[in-house]
A protein has these predicted regions:
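Sec-dependent N-terminal signal peptides
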Residues: 8-9
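Formylglycine-dependent sulfatase
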Residues: 2-4, 13, 20-271
């Protein structure tokens, strides 16, 4: 079992309905259940990947997964924005039938602070997944899987009791909307959750760019896998990158190109 894994890499969302199918099959689970690793890249367009024809951006590791797996040519997100798409992914419902249909809402939900990339704050209203909402994590947990979410949940609104550990995940390592201290800055975070405990990242104090969120998330994911070698597990690894163009940590691959990285960032920001 520990040598078998299903790995999915996706830029947006799971096809709605798969969580519901998993619920029907959970009672038939056998000892030969595969491990499941689901990797989500935030705001990554399929045209940005080399394996889908991009001539600009180099994605060698994703290309390796594509070469040994299956590429989908007609796979659609539940929504074009973050929270509704993640809600469709977690519940298996299309956006028209799911609880979360926008990043913000005008009625219901809870209000809280939102921090912009520039560090400004504003008050917004968000809704969250409720205890009665079945997620793929609750289904797999009931089937005997160890479940873990690493990094971005984005389905908690401003309710601390709607974090991943209250929605089917045994472990959570990442940041929450409901806690301002953990959701900014995104890429060199000062704080981060370990289940329901807020951990301070001393290395990034005073705007020091020492521990990148992608590296922290990768380490958390690897450690979860190591701890669960003998268990069937479901790992949902939801990276922030490449959500914003300014998070690029190393651009030396592109030093010899005729275009500049600023050109790419400008096109991304204005698209």
């Amino acid at each position: 079992m520990k040598n078998k894994a299903f790995i999915g890499v996706i830029a947006a969302s799971l096809v709605p309905g798969q969580a519901a199918m998993a619920q029907n099959k959970a009672v038939k689970a056998t000892a030969d259940r595969p491990n499941i690793i689901f990797i989500l890249a935030d705001d990554l367009g399929y045209g940005d990947l080399s394996c889908y024809g991009s001539k600009t951006i180099k994605t060698p590791n994703i290309d390796k997964l594509a070469a040994t797996g299956t590429r989908f040519n007609q796979s659609y997100a539940g929504s074009g924005i973050s929270s509704p798409s993640r809600c469709a992914l977690m519940t298996g419902k299309n956006t028209g039938n799911s609880r979360i249909r926008d990043n913000m809402c005008t009625a219901g939900g809870m209000t809280g602070l939102k921090i912009t990339p520039e560090g400004d704050t504003t008050i917004v209203r968000r809704t969250s997944l409720q205890p009665q909402d079945t997620t793929i994590a609750t289904v797999l947990h009931a089937a005997g899987y160890k479940t873990c979410l690493v990094n971005k949940w984005h389905l908690d609104g401003y309710d601390p009791k709607s974090s991943p550990i209250y929605r089917g995940f045994d472990e959570f390592h990442g940041w929450l909307i409901s806690t301002v201290e953990s959701n900014s800055p995104y890429y060199y975070p000062y704080n981060r959750f370990d289940n329901d405990k807020l951990i301070h990242i001393k290395a990034n104090e005073h705007d020091k760019h020492i521990k990148h969120n992608t590296d922290i998330s990768t380490d958390d994911a690897i450690n979860f896998i190591k701890r669960n070698k003998k268990n069937p597990f479901f790992l949902y690894l939801a990276f922030d990158a490449p959500h914003e163009p300014y998070i690029i940590d190393n651009t030396t691959w592109y030093d010899d190109e005729s275009w500049s990285m600023n050109d790419i960032c400008l096109r991304t920001s204005t698209a």
